[in-house]
Amino acid sequence: NLSVARAAEPKVIGSFKSWSAHLFAEKKGRVCYLHGVPRKSIGKYTKRGEVYLQVTHRPAAKTRNEVSITAGYAHKKGSDVKAVIDGKTFVLFTETDTAWVGDATSDAQLVAAMRAGRTMVVTGISARGTSTKDTYSLAGFTAAHKAISKSCRVK
């Protein structure tokens, strides 16, 4: 499972405008992640679960800047999610209700764009064929990213 483990109760490191930073301990060491929710969601859906974006550092696993976007619904099989930041498009692959970039280089590029950007618009399509558009404010993202990087000693 690539999503953030819920085994240990996370500790809040801080809140930074639209983003919060968290830390918890696993057997192999610290895990730090930032969490944000869209400020606006558009779509003709009747029911939708929790929608959020996380960036996770797991130094013991040599994982850093792992971006995951949870849609609140099961994605259409084989569909991609698009994240657009100030005109630059990133394509993420989907598995059940979550989307990932797929490799460490692309994660780092997406995080760099999020740190430099103002707004991110994420579009996806549900298993039922419903299109969604979620808009995230990137205000506070850089501060939250610095906080998790410091807490997990990631450069």
What is each residue range found by the language model?
Residues 5-155:
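A generic "folded-domain core" signal
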